[in-house]
Amino acid sequence: MTISNSVPITPELIAAHGLKPDEYQRILDLVGREPSFTELGIFSAMWNEHCSYKSSKKWLRTLPTTGPQVIQGPGENAGVVDIGDGDCVVFKMESHNHPSFIEPYQGAATGVGGILRDVFTMGARPIAAMNALRFGAPDHPKTRHLVAGVVSGVGGYGNSFGVPTVGGEVNFDARYNGNILVNAFAAGLAKTNAIFLSEAKGVGLPVVYLGAKTGRDGVGGATMASAEFDDKIDEKRPTVQVGDPFTEKCLLEACLELMASGAVIAIQDMGAAGLTCSAVEMGAKGDLGIELDLDKVPVREERMSAYEMMLSESQERMLMVLRPEKEKEAEAIFHKWGLDFAIVGKTTDDLRFRVLHQGDQVADLPIKDLGDKAPEYDRPWIEPKKPAPLAANDIPQADVADALLKLLGGPDLSSRRWVWEQYDTLIQGNSLQLPGGDAGVVRVEGHATKALAFSSDVTPRYCEADPYEGGKQAVAECWRNLTATGALPLAATDNLNFGNPERPEIMGQLVGAVKGIGDACRALGFPIVSGNVSLYNETNGQGILPTPTIGGVGLIADWSKMVRTGFAAQDQMILLVGAPASWGTHLGQSVYFRDIHGRTDGPPPPVDLAHEKRVGDHVRSLIASGIVTAAHDVSDGGIAVALAEMAMASGIGATVPGLVGTDPIPVWFGEDQGRYLLTLSIDPHGDEWDAIRKQQGELGIFAPWIGSTGGDALKLGDAKAIPVGDLKAAHEGWFPRFMDQAS
């Protein structure tokens, strides 16, 4: 079946394309006539939230995006950060939420494929991937099916392509029942003098189509990704793309070989809105027009219309502006790799986007108004209502050991081994830390000592309670996780997942979170260099928890001094760095409240950014000195869970006497921010320890020696000792049991 270009443009058709009446009027004013059906599709694709960021652009501009290490900030396919010696790291995080809910395997797989293309389009070879996944309640009938499909899709694509998955997150909450989140991160290495951008340059130059053939899969995908879901969700299945990781691997090698030949002027991957978005972005960025001849586009289905070809989101495709004298060489490279190579258009000097098909001009539009001059909204927003503070004596009690075992064996804090064992975490041979620690770490190929650390973080329940503090905390925890390996945090990418921005309370969540992210990034010297916004994550009016995911990258100068989470030896001192005098105080929004007592009240823990920076810099200096043998940031579940994780990672127990005369619940389960647990290899009664104590006093950092490693059990204060084997059994049991339940 093919779709005519002369379909009548009705109000119903306009609405079906996600365009509001005032937006359609703007189209009429710009074009001076009724648009063709293909033109309507082009406007719909370019003006939706997924491509235009029309609801969030105003606030994204407030984020810090520069720094001495930043080579390329937002606006390109990925961010680029200098790591010295002529090398740079290229990275980005992007959502594939809506497709993954409709068709979990292909949705997740093509999410991985898309983010890998964003990285190698810039000239970088991918070296690491992460995935931040949010699913509905474990007892929801769809959850297990979605988990199985998404994890299989992530592993199927990443493993076949050949990139290690080094970290990520998996969480469950009923607010994701109708909208799961699949946020995919990728990073690659490139040379600082060989970064490739998407800005077209030069008039009359060939525009070249590269990669796989075009089919009807994914038609309307970008528009679907900008809409709320309803009960007819399964009808959207045809708009999910289908990925082929082996073709993508060939595309990677062909692109890098072509880039090395000097043939590439500009290059853009075909992601959301396919040929439309890639062509418009290349032309608009370069202040050039683009003319495309769709009769030249390689297709794998018969009788495809111009509309379908322009909006197809078939995977593993690129668009490039080529040096004309290199055409034969470029074509030979792509044919060698078994890929299509076709000159499908040219650059022009008239700022028009023209599309030809079967002898007709099916689109003739102003390219800048499609691209960087798309509509932008200053949507009304209201400050979200914040929860009341908890009364000082509002500390519900529980047996400390029993509560710890229940937390470790629950849906949110249990081991994710079932997930990451389906991913190839060691391919390429450079992975230095397996998933399950604070951050993934990968050696920098060709350098004797350098490594890169990667972490992905956000605590949605904090963001729901207070978006500003939640935004700050997402950045701070990411920065802290990188620091806990010994890495210097360099820069971050954000993936902002929210509900319907046309509701002022939801827009208020977005505004608050972005303000918090911006303040934290400025205070920590941790700029945002790339990112993605995913809105309308709602089903039948029920929105997700606000989830501004932060993916961070850090540099380890000497990976021989890198530290891991697990205790390294018996009889080593345990240090709690950055804590208040009572070690822990804050129970509002804690997992202890939620999972032990069924409470979701109270404010989230505040983040003191000056304290965060001071403590993190101190921890990093201790690690660099070589005396730290293990490190772990304290987050969900407080000190108790952090100590248990360190014990389980090593099989070594610990004894931590606790505080006399202090309620043990906030001590062990409080989620105060800015804290680390370290083990040291030095004599706690020697001069070296005295010098460290003196330095901490001068910095105003409270860092008590709270206990020692040793034995095969974890003993917290007066609570009964828990054998490390029992901790592991609780921790490792939940996920396999959940996934093995009979359907």
From Swiss-Prot:
Substrate binds at residues 95-98, 117, 241, 313-315, 534. One of its GO terms (cellular component) is cytoplasm. Part of the phosphoribosylformylglycinamidine synthase complex involved in the purines biosynthetic pathway. Catalyzes the ATP-dependent conversion of formylglycinamide ribonucleotide (FGAR) and glutamine to yield formylglycinamidine ribonucleotide (FGAM) and glutamate. The FGAM synthase complex is composed of three subunits. PurQ produces an ammonia molecule by converting glutamine to glutamate. PurL transfers the ammonia molecule to FGAR to form FGAM in an ATP-dependent manner. Monomer. Part of the FGAM synthase complex composed of 1 PurL, 1 PurQ and 2 PurS subunits. The keyword Magnesium applies. It comes from the Bacteria. Mg(2+) 1 binds at residues 94, 532. It is found in: Cytoplasm. This is Phosphoribosylformylglycinamidine synthase subunit PurL. GO terms for biological process: 'de novo' IMP biosynthetic process. The active site is at 50, 96 (proton acceptor). Keywords: ATP-binding, Cytoplasm, Ligase, Magnesium, Metal-binding, Nucleotide-binding, Purine biosynthesis. GO terms for molecular function: ATP binding; magnesium ion binding; phosphoribosylformylglycinamidine synthase activity. It holds the Pfam family AIRS_C. It catalyses: N(2)-formyl-N(1)-(5-phospho-beta-D-ribosyl)glycinamide + L-glutamine + ATP + H2O = 2-formamido-N(1)-(5-O-phospho-beta-D-ribosyl)acetamidine + L-glutamate + ADP + phosphate + H(+). Its EC number is 6.3.5.3. It comes from Mesorhizobium japonicum (strain LMG 29417 / CECT 9101 / MAFF 303099). It is an enzyme of class 6 (ligase).
